[in-house]
Amino acid sequence: MFFSSKKCKTVXKTFRGPCVRNAN
């Protein structure tokens, strides 16, 4: 995705988007 690994953790946690997988 267009989200960075670091941002993925934060975004994910907030928006619970596709990056949530990495955050978990």
Swiss-Prot record:
The UniProt record lists the keyword rRNA-binding:
no
Grouped into one coarse class, the protein's main location is secreted
Does Hydrolase show up as a keyword for this record? no
Keyword field: Antibiotic, Antimicrobial, Cell wall, Fungicide, Plant defense, Secreted
GO biological process assignments:
defense response to bacterium; defense response to fungus; killing of cells of another organism
According to the UniProt record, one GO cellular component term is:
extracellular region
- Where does this protein reside within or beyond the cell? Secreted, Cell wall
Let me know which tissues express this protein, per UniProt. Answer: Distributed in the epidermal cell layer of leaves and in the subepidermal layer region of stems. Not in roots.
Family listed: Belongs to the DEFL family. Group IV subfamily.
* Record function comment: Antimicrobial peptide. Active against Fusarium spp., Gram-positive and Gram-negative bacterial pathogens.
The identity of this protein, by name, is: Defensin D5
